[in-house]
Design a protein with these regions (language model features):
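N-terminal beta-alpha lobe that positions the nucleotide/phosphoryl donor
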Residues: 1-123
Length: 123
């Protein structure tokens, strides 16, 4: 079991993951943009890390900042929630390269989902 999980998301999904972590005795680490500093998920988490300015591309979609936050807080795993990086195979590979577990499908599964989506759109 993990000791700590970094939640790479915001809002209600992050709150639900934080509460699940608490119920399981796992420490939660919230990431947040400067715009979200007063959000509920930030308040509820055991630890919190600012990952940049407001636009998602500069914060919640910035893979390097999220990996850095996970490493700096000794997170055992990253939970992406949904959206943002949850279906990004490159992010899954980056987690693996940095010794951080990714809670979600493998990069290969995500790659195959993308290929199936491309097949359907080309029909």
């Amino acid at each position: 079991m993990f000791r700590s999980i970094l939640i790479a998301n915001r809002g209600e999904i992050a709150v639900r993951i934080i509460r699940a972590c608490r119920n399981m005795g796992i420490k939660s680490i919230a990431v947040y943009s400067k715009e979200d500093k007063d959000s509920l998920h930030v308040q509820l988490a055991d630890r919190r890390v600012c990952i940049g300015e407001g636009p998602a591309k500069n914060s919640y979609l910035n893979m390097e900042r999220i990996i850095s936050a996970a490493k700096n807080t000794d997170a055992d795993a990253i939970h992406p929630g949904f959206g943002f990086l949850s279906e990004n195979a490159d992010f899954v590979r980056l987690c693996k390269e940095n010794g951080i577990a990714f809670i979600g499908p493998s990069a290969e599964v995500i790659d195959s989902m993308g290929n199936r989506s491309e097949e359907h759109t080309s029909e």
